[in-house]
Each structure stands twice: as structure tokens, then as C-alpha cells.
């Protein structure tokens, strides 16, 4: 057995079987399909166009349009790569024509696109729930206010920068303004209300206990399919493409989850979590100093690694330590999520930069990196605020579920 006892192979079979039969994880392909179908319906482009025309006379209006659309579609797609790519395609051309600063524009697009990893129904939170033995509905409720906090920090930062230097976000030229505000409001309504209603119905049914995450994901997927049909964007070829994309993304996530789960189980059988917990507790350090060390470690691991191995391997190893320190696990899960979101904006392996560069080749990669690092600092500020004020994450779950 190549140096392994036969029990290791039994353990591998058991772990793969447990992951593949976990009912909560059945929500993953359904949420992925929901996001892809809403993306194909073209609602993101329609909403962005209407919002930018509504604020055409406001300095930095395209920054606000990007962030507003990011929040709405983060809740719809939950796929960072897709969000950054679509935002880049939509916004970069308008920003270039209007003379917007490339660095600030790139930072806004990439930061807005990464909100999908945090704002419910985040696929990462769906996976993290069973690993940490936390109800997914608690994680969804806990992630809402931190997501809004980060989006608000982004908006405040762009506003302050544009107030100090108006050239960073000039008002839109006349040829990019609407001839009739009535048409703008119709476009805004058609672009916002249907996807928002679908997202709020799916998310609300989870938060208020009307449906499990898997049931809500199924309803959301069907709703997105009907929405695409209503907007006359659904064709057989597009449906086939969406199904293939869903299969590819889901297969990748599930295999990584199963393999990482097996790897973590082997570590647990070797006693690694216990050794780590006993060692760090034996140092008699301040528990918040240990928390800071954990956050730095996760942040550094987020540079070369995807979120799946970190959530599936690292988190189970440090979970006994976090419990021994007396930290609230729901709060800790949100800290991890925000931390991993920060890693998407951290050079040199920031994948968001490459997604954006792929669709906006005229922007220099150095400028994209510089813009992202500004928002990475905002992410760290947001993370520190959630550590100092745990109620940012815990207030809504406590209000809804009393725990």
C-alpha cells in the first residue's frame, strides 16, 4: 500500500462518500446554474447602463454603478471570475471614454467582483457550513452586513478620492447621457426588479426558515431559467453551454472538496489539530494575538491557494484551537471569508487581476495591481472592524434566530 495502511484507503472512500452525499452541498450546482443563467439573461448590462445614465452628472458615477451592480449580482452569481470579467467588459470601455483613472477603475471593478465570495448565497459559505458544523442559514445571515460594510467602504473611498481630485472620475460626456429619463427608469426597473426579486426570494426563504439552502437553490435555478426565457435570451445552445459550465465548475469544486476533506481527515487522525491546540494554548498568549496569527496565516495561504483547500484542510486543523479559545464560530467563519476575499486582491497571485487583464488588455497589469492594493487596504480595515465589533457579523443571526 505504498507505505499506507489499508485503513487509509477505507478512510478515503468514506470521506469521498460523505462529501458526495452531503445534502447541503447539493445547493452548489444549483446556485452555480442560477448565476450562469442570470448572467446570460443580460440583466447585468441593462442595470449598469441604466444606473450610469441616472448618475451621468455625478462625479465618479461609473464607480458607483460598478459597485451597485456588483452587490446585486454578487448575490446572484457568487462566482468571482465571472463577476470581474463581466464588470470589466461592461465598465472599462465607458471608463476609458470618460477619462477615468485606470488604477482606481481597476481597483473598483476587481474589488466589486470579489464580493461574490462573501455576499449570500456564497458557494464558499455553503461549503464552509458543514465543515465547521454551522447551519448555512447562520452564515448567510452573518455575511450580509459585512458585505454591505465592505461595499460602503469602497464607495466612501471612491467618493473621497473624486472629491480631492475630480479628474479621477469626471462627469459623463453628453453623448453618454440619456435623451429621456423615462427610458432610463424603465431600463433600471427591468434590470433591477426581476433579478433582485429572485435573489431576495431565494435568500429570504433561507433566512426566514421557509426552505433549506438546497430547496431555495433549486427554486432560484428554476426562476433564473424562467427569467432568461422571459427576456428572450434562452436558446438551446445557451442552455447547453450553461449546463456544461455548471458541470465543469461543480465537478471541480466537489472533487477539490472531497480530496481536501480526505487530506484533512488524515491530518486529524495523526493528531495534528490536538498538537497544535495544546502547543499554542501552552504558550499562554493573548487569544486575540493567536487570532491575529491565524488571520495572517490564512491571508498568506490565500496568495498561492484557492479557497477550497484552505477551507477544507486548514480550517479543520485550527478549528479545535478556535473553539478552545472561546471564539464564536459563526463570527470566525465570516472573518475567514473576508480574509479569503482579501487574498483575491493581493498581488502577486491575485487572480482578479488576470481576469480583468484578459478582457481589458489595454490596461497595464502594473496599474491593475496598484488599484487592487488600494482596495486590499480597505479590506483589511473592514476585517479589523469586524474583529473589534463582532456584532457586525452576529447582530442579524442573533436577531433572526436568537443565538
Q: Where in this protein do the model-derived segments appear?
A:
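Alpha-helical transmembrane segments of multi-pass membrane transport proteins
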Residues: 1-403
Amino acid at each position: 500500500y505504498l507505505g499506507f495502511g489499508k485503513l487509509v484507503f477505507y478512510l478515503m472512500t468514506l470521506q469521498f462518500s460523505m462529501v458526495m452525499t452531503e445534502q447541503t452541498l447539493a445547493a452548489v450546482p444549483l446556485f452555480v446554474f442560477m448565476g450562469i443563467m442570470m448572467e446570460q439573461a443580460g440583466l447585468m448590462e441593462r442595470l449598469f447602463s441604466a444606473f450610469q445614465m441616472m448618475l451621468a452628472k455625478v462625479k465618479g458615477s461609473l464607480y458607483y454603478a460598478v459597485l451597485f451592480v456588483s452587490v446585486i449580482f454578487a448575490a446572484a452569481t457568487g462566482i468571482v471570475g465571472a463577476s470581474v470579467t463581466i464588470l470589466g467588459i461592461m465598465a472599462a470601455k465607458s471608463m476609458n471614454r470618460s477619462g477615468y483613472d485606470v488604477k482606481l477603475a481597476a481597483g473598483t471593478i476587481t474589488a466589486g467582483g470579489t464580493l461574490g465570495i462573501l455576499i449570500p448565497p456564497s458557494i464558499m459559505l455553503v461549503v464552509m457550513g458543514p465543515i465547521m458544523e454551522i447551519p448555512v442559514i447562520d452564515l448567510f445571515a452573518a455575511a450580509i452586513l459585512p458585505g454591505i460594510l465592505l461595499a460602503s467602504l469602497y464607495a466612501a473611498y471612491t467618493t473621497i478620492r473624486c472629491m480631492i481630485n475630480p479628474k479621477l472620475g469626471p462627469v459623463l460626456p453628453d453623448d453618454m447621457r440619456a435623451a429621456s429619463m423615462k427610458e432610463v427608469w424603465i431600463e433600471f426597473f427591468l434590470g433591477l426588479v426581476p433579478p433582485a426579486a429572485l435573489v431576495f426570494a431565494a435568500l429570504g426563504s433561507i433566512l426566514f426558515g421557509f426552505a433549506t439552502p438546497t430547496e431555495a437553490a433549486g427554486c432560484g435555478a428554476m426562476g433564473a431559467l424562467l427569467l432568461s426565457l422571459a427576456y428572450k435570451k434562452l436558446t438551446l445552445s445557451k442552455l447547453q453551454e450553461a449546463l456544461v459550465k455548471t458541470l465543469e465548475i461543480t465537478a471541480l469544486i466537489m472533487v477539490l472538496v472531497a480530496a481536501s476533506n480526505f487530506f484533512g481527515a488524515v491530518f486529524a487522525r495523526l493528531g495534528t489539530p490536538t498538537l497544535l491546540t495544546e502547543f499554542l494554548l501552552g504558550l499562554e498568549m493573548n487569544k486575540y494575538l493567536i487570532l491575529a496569527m491565524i488571520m495572517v496565516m490564512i491571508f498568506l495561504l490565500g496568495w498561492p491557494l484557492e479557497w477550497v483547500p484552505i477551507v477544507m484542510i486548514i480550517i479543520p486543523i485550527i478549528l479545535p484551537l478556535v473553539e478552545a479559545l472561546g471564539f464564536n464560530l459563526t463570527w470566525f467563519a465570516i472573518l475567514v471569508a473576508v480574509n479569503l476575499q482579501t487574498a483575491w486582491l493581493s498581488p502577486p497571485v491575485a487572480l482578479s487581476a488576470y481576469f480583468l487583464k484578459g478582457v481589458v488588455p489595454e490596461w497595464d497589469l502594473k496599474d491593475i495591481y496598484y488599484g487592487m492594493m488600494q482596495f486590499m487596504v480597505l479590506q483589511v480595515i473592514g476585517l479589523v472592524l469586524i474583529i473589534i465589533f463582532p456584532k457586525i457579523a452576529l447582530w442579524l443571526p442573533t436577531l433572526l434566530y436568537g443565538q
